Regions:
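Short tight loops/turns at secondary-structure junctions
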Residues: 1-28, 40
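Short, positively biased Gly/Pro-containing turn/loop motifs at secondary-structure boundaries
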Residues: 37-66
Length: 66
């Protein structure tokens, strides 16, 4: 990705800290959107057996022009 910008990805995380769903909510060109969604799907969070079965949130990725 050669351009810069911001991409917001909505994620769903299970109790094991795994991202079970990710989709781009806004921003970026096709390259940035693909890279941000891939990075979100590969993210891991803390395991919490007492957490809700599913939690949702967003991750904002900021791309710097290269």
């Amino acid at each position: 990705c050669e351009s810069g910008g911001e991409v917001v990805v909505e994620i769903t995380v299970n109790r094991a800290g795994e991202v079970t769903a990710a989709r781009v909510r806004s921003g970026g060109d096709a390259c940035m959107r693909e890279m941000a969604e891939r990075a979100a799907r590969n993210s891991l969070f803390n395991i919490d057996d007492s957490a809700p079965a599913r939690q949702t949130g967003t991750i904002t990725y900021i791309f710097i022009p290269q």
